[in-house]
Amino acid sequence: MRLGVNIDHIATVREARKTYEPDPVKGAIIARDAGADQITFHLREDRRHIQDSDVEKLRAVITEIPLNMEMAATEEMKQIAIRIKPDRVTIVPEKREEITTEGGLDVVSMTDYLREFIKELKDNGINVATFVDPVEEQIKASMEVGADAVEIHTGEYANARSDKERDNEIFRIKKAAVYGRSLGLKVFAGHGLTYTNVQPVAEIEEIEELNIGHSIIANAIFLGLDEAVRKMKKLINEVRRKDIRV
């Protein structure tokens, strides 16, 4: 199983003072060298953390492992992606007032628009995933609009308050992952995953990649980023020994 390390919150700390450090690009290099299988970042429309200059630098230095750009389905972001050429674009919903992404993309309501949007990205050599809730209707629509993969939103699982709720959410995620694979899609997962809740998701064999950011960066304050990445990789590998490549 691959681990994508999201570096957004390194930039969040930097932007708290509108200064030059910590540098998310340096963080990406450390994460890569610690065993990250992918670097993920979200260039938001409001530029609250990652900046355009970061994106340019990330593309220049992250060449040995995939670079995954999370973005809203806007014309501005599409043109940036076509110019930068990340290895993958993950299309996410975005609201300016939200603290973090609050749910999955409603692909069903945007099929005509997304079909053309995704085609242009793929015509420029970029793989495309949609970030969706564990709902078969959204996964099927993702396949129909031409996505190569779905990333299943694990936020409801992460926010579950009881063992029963967590078990129910794991069942939903597992069912969605099986369905996605049956349609020929690659299946990833992420959002709200931590050192204490990651393993039940990592055990789902249909999921081949997890994207994790906040928990790793939060622990890096105390452990250092290198050790924080290695610790997460170790937890995943304890339940998933199979190494799946793009």
UniProtKB/Swiss-Prot annotation:
Residue numbers binding 3-amino-2-oxopropyl phosphate: N6, R17, G192, G213, H214
Pathway per the UniProt entry: Cofactor biosynthesis; pyridoxine 5'-phosphate biosynthesis; pyridoxine 5'-phosphate from D-erythrose 4-phosphate: step 5/5
Pfam family, one: PdxJ
Self-association state and partner proteins as the record states: Homooctamer; tetramer of dimers.
Native organism taxonomy: Bacteria, Pseudomonadati, Aquificota, Aquificia, Aquificales
Organism: Persephonella marina (strain DSM 14350 / EX-H1)
Protein name: Pyridoxine 5'-phosphate synthase
Active-site residue list: H42 (proton acceptor), E70 (proton acceptor), H191 (proton donor)
CDD domains hit by this protein: PNPsynthase
EC category name: transferase
Catalytic activity, as annotated: 3-amino-2-oxopropyl phosphate + 1-deoxy-D-xylulose 5-phosphate = pyridoxine 5'-phosphate + phosphate + 2 H2O + H(+)
CC annotations in GO: cytosol
NCBIfam families linked to this entry: pdxJ (TIGR00559), PRK05265.1-3 (NF003625), PRK05265.1-5 (NF003627)
GO MF annotation list: pyridoxine 5'-phosphate synthase activity
Residues the UniProt record annotates as site (Transition state stabilizer): E151
UniProt keyword terms in alphabetical order: Cytoplasm, Pyridoxine biosynthesis, Transferase
EC number(s) given by UniProt: 2.6.99.2
Coiled-coil residue spans: none
Binding-site residues, 1-deoxy-D-xylulose 5-phosphate: D8, H9, R44, H49, T100
Gene behind the chain: pdxJ
Presence of keyword Cytoplasm: yes
Subcellular location as annotated: Cytoplasm
SUPFAM superfamilies from the UniProt entry: Pyridoxine 5'-phosphate synthase
